[in-house]
Amino acid sequence: MKKLLFVFAGLAFALTAAAQEFRITHGPYLCDMSQDGVTVVWTTNRPALSWVEASPADSLAPAPPPRHYQTVAGRKLAGRTLHAVRVRGLQPGTDYRYRIFSQEVQSWPDVNNVTYGKTVGADASRRRAYGFRTFPAAGSGCSFLVLNDIHGKADVLTRLCKRVDFSELGFVAFNGDMSSSVESGEQLFKDYLDA
């Protein structure tokens, strides 16, 4: 009887997991900003091929912006749930708009045979794309915020940042001790990234 119960429980779990829509679960987050580039990071609930489309904010170009992929030795990385796409070739002190996309990898039986599924974008419910400004040329100033010693207390982080106008900051740095210990990737989002 116990075996039968475990079989039904496993089947119910598998059906529930399969029924979940493919989606972006966290992000996007901007990392490693410079005068001429930025890395855009996000996660999905299933493996995917992901890309960023970025263009100057004042651009009126009717053509779609170029796609930037996460690559190694020129090969696009797919089959991952953590996506970190470097956008290169940007101009210093310039406003950009960007969108992120992930296309589900449904199966990948061998290196030359990938079946892709649904494509999702994090800004589908937004009227406009996300935005950022690259760091200014050398000698220009910028404002930033340094946070540390939160130790997984997201409520403390939320209270500390309540009056911060993030639109006035060039960047936010997490200096250390943001979690007391890390047991899973999901904990990082719960402890401070999604706060």
Identify the role of each PLM range:
Residues 1-4:
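Positively charged n-region of N-terminal signal peptides that target proteins for export
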Residues 8, 56-57, 127, 153, ...:
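Alpha-helix initiation/capping motif
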Residues 9-18:
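Hydrophobic h-region of N-terminal signal peptides that target proteins for export
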Residues 18-146, 166-167:
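Acidic, histidine-bearing metal-coordination/catalytic regions of metal-dependent phosphoesterases
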Residues 109-110, 139-195:
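Active-site neighborhood of divalent metal-dependent phosphoester/pyrophosphate hydrolases
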